[in-house]
Amino acid sequence: MKACGIVAEYNPLHTGHVYQMNKTRQISQADCIIVVMSGNFVQRGEPAVIDKYARTSAALKAGADIVVELPVYYALSSAENFAKGAVLTLNEMKAASICFGAETDNADCLAKISRTIISESPEYKAILNKALAEGLSYPAARQTALLEYLPECKDIITGSNNILAIEYIKAILYNNLNMTYYPVLREGAGYNDDSDTAEYASAFGIRKMLMSDEHDKLKTYLTAGMYEEISNSKSCPLFPDDFSNIFNHKMLFIKQICNINNTDFAEKLAEYEDISPDIANRFVAAFTGRDNITEFAMKVKSKNIVYSRICRCIMHIILEIRKSMSDSYNNIPYIRLLGFNKTGQQYLGSIKKELDVPFITKAADYKKELIFDFACSDIYAQAVYEKYGYVMKNELQQNIIRI
């Protein structure tokens, strides 16, 4: 059997995602579609609006054959690390190819950009360093350098929806993987578009509908399975500000153990993943213990520190994701199965003897490996309880979803 991979968050799953699944099966001619999905936290530095098991069920009903979880360390990483974790997971699962959404289906140009970033020629590096010296954030500086170095790829470089596409290809090329890649031209609203007039709304736009209680519009854009999960859920939607109390308490605790010394406070914060000394100092200066997460992030962001990075840093503090953990994730430590159908079961049976890392189907047998992800899920469940008074099942009580 031949498998093709999709990397997703399905936050939440909408009709545009189904379009991608159908195109993936058509383009790749795969027998099996494997989805590597973020769990309860997503790459923007936010909680998923609904838990990973509900999203897994909806994904399987919409056409996925297997859903595995992207470990939270990767799920809350930069685009580069997010893509690396997902691509390496698909490689471990013997996927022959990967399909991803982009604003172009020009795979050659996407690969050209990826190779430029990997090779870092002296000319490209000089342009990049100059842009960084001018105070641009790294993503903005890289875009500036690529535009000057590869003017023929201008439209692709400036497309925000191409960032992850480039990172997926980069991960494949950098790791010398034998994996074919297929960009799928996006249809409908873009990733950050909140329009509700396109045939396919963006997940961002749908989250805004959820936040505004515009449930009457949801049925138009969500898959039937996702709409049913959200309608019947006692634990959604969840948003970043629902974690504000947890964040403020955590920051106050760190400050207290530093004896309210701002220098020590900043040094402690800089131990967390992706928090530079500059970001740590900005956190210390902005922190009052009274802001919600959105207000705090808006205070801290700057010209060269983008909002989504600040949100990830906040989640790293909440979830105890530290720089010292990075060595444990140089390679995929395990693969955790969230759900499958009959086709997926057949595929898993065909590859199980070829897997090089633990393939987790029963969480109770891998408590040591999953202890960190368990803790993250418990924090998600705590936010649900504080908002809705609903007690979610813990990870040992949850069953794999079978369709």
From Swiss-Prot:
Sequence positions that bind ATP: 7-20, 101, 161, 186
EC number annotated for this UniProt entry: 6.3.4.-
A Gene Ontology biological process term: tRNA modification
Highest rank taxon of the organism: Bacteria
InterPro entries (UniProt xref): Rossmann-like_a/b/a_fold (IPR014729), tRNA(Met)_cyd_acetate_ligase (IPR008513)
Subcellular location as annotated: Cytoplasm
ATP-binding is among the record's keywords: yes
GO molecular function: ATP binding; ligase activity, forming carbon-nitrogen bonds; tRNA binding
Major localisation: cytoplasm
Keywords (A to Z) from UniProt: ATP-binding, Cytoplasm, Ligase, Nucleotide-binding, RNA-binding, tRNA processing, tRNA-binding
Catalytic activity of the protein: cytidine(34) in elongator tRNA(Met) + acetate + ATP = N(4)-acetylcytidine(34) in elongator tRNA(Met) + AMP + diphosphate
Gene3D superfamilies in UniProt: HUPs
SUPFAM superfamilies reported for this sequence: Nucleotidylyl transferase (SSF52374)
Gene Ontology cellular component list: cytoplasm
HAMAP family the record matches: TmcAL (MF_01539)
Family: Belongs to the TmcAL family.
Function comment: Catalyzes the formation of N(4)-acetylcytidine (ac(4)C) at the wobble position of elongator tRNA(Met), using acetate and ATP as substrates. First activates an acetate ion to form acetyladenylate (Ac-AMP) and then transfers the acetyl group to tRNA to form ac(4)C34.
NCBIfam families: PRK13670.1 (NF010191)
Name under which the protein is recorded: tRNA(Met) cytidine acetate ligase
Organism of origin: Lachnospira eligens (strain ATCC 27750 / DSM 3376 / VPI C15-48 / C15-B4)
Gene: tmcAL
